Amino acid sequence: DPYIIDSIGWAYYLVDDYIKAEKFLNIAVQLMPDDPIVSDHYGDILWKLDRKIQARYFWKNVLQMKDTDEEMIKNINIKLIYGLDNS
């Protein structure tokens, strides 16, 4: 289940294991390329792995998704301006 894969990856992110988190979220993004939450999570992980250009690519992509709500749009725009550490 792609949602479980996302959740496992996010759990690794929350305990600062970004390498393992990236492995799971990479799979989740491939399985659910149009899910804004998964792409946002993946962007956050990429940022923590110092892959900032790729992180911004995923965050910008979230802004184009039809299921992105207003609160997420606001949060993504803050990340795009200030990065993750200041959002």
Task: List the predicted regions and their residue ranges.
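Canonical tetratricopeptide repeat
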Residues: 7, 41, 75-79
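Conserved structural position within tetratricopeptide repeats
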Residues: 29-30, 64
